[in-house]
Amino acid sequence: MMKNLLSVLLIFSMSVVTDETKDIAYIYSYDNTNQIVMNIEAALARAQASQGIIPEWAAEEITKKAEVRYMPKTEVDAENEFVRHRLVSRLNVWKRSLDNGAEEYLHYGATTVDIFDTVLVLQIKASLGILIDDLIEIENLLLKLTKDNIETYMAGRTIGQHALPITFGKKTSTWLAENRRNIERLK
């Protein structure tokens, strides 16, 4: 139980995106996906080492080499032609850079689904942060639009027909409220 909790805490404390790379395309890019895979594998190795499952030196070596430069796309693509497995090809290339037998402990006890599900969750989590920032920007624009049009009259609508007059500010205030609810749901 403790080791599962430790693994979860290590993995979900990882940052997937930085201020310099606040871009949805970057979050799902090949290099960033590989870096997240490496971060997860390194976190798993550290958690396992802390519980005595793998040697500490192996976890240190895996963590030290958890950089995307040790998983070049050309080598991964070539390896994938041979093994036809999206994670095995990545791990095989990365293992070649590990020293002192640490490659034996890379991906120890994990499954492809464990790794790629965690990658996806971290990418979605990072994407939500960007989406929330965008919705807050929209909220500020809607607030200005609402204030600027508080006395701008327009025809109300009901079931596709004109209804009693309302203000455009009233109409945009409903968009503002809906946008705020969406922000709260995403948080």
Regions found by a protein language model. Give the residues of each.
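A helix-coil-helix interface module used to build multimeric assemblies
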Residues: 15-187
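Sec-dependent N-terminal signal peptides
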Residues: 4-13
